[in-house]
């Protein structure tokens, strides 16, 4: 999506992101040009699940028996962000960058506009029960998707009058629920935040001009599977270019791909495979 927008010379006045949107948003805000977007795409093309989600029996067991409130250590994700984020602090970004996290005690949406970029983004991407919350300024912060995966209210509060939303969408052609706890958690978060996005668009459409770039559909790749990232990036770029050619920036409709739907119908008695696997 981002590639196609940058190719057309579309440049934002500010960037607001939560969860994976915080990762992409912070990188793009630091390098808001075509070369930066190509570098970001190259990073995603080279990622594998173990680079972000280092699954292990010991960590999973400790989380399961209540010895720690998360399944995975954030070390690999922290190292990945440290290697690739182009700025050390959010306020150093070339385009104002705002990262949304959630206070795990109050549920409050927290907008981070300054401070250490790695820790801020790590907090926004800390999926509850998967990664531990991140302490910033005496607050325990977790995945911004809990408060608002597409933080329209935060962007409006920062003065935005026109919003271009780049949603992830959700896996709508899976033949069975994800088999791993991680995959199921990510799929559930995607469903939840996609539904909330539609609600937020309806809520704020009279307040600001909101344009939503249609996500890929059909989509048959699990959120925890990075092996198809290159294909998805290419598909999204092609789809977004076509959408732009058809006057997409002038549309105000919620894409059908964001509404509840599925391309695979489950039938009673159909085997779905195990859903209890913790790996």
Task: Name the predicted role of every residue range.
Residues 1-18, 23-279:
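Patatin-like phospholipase
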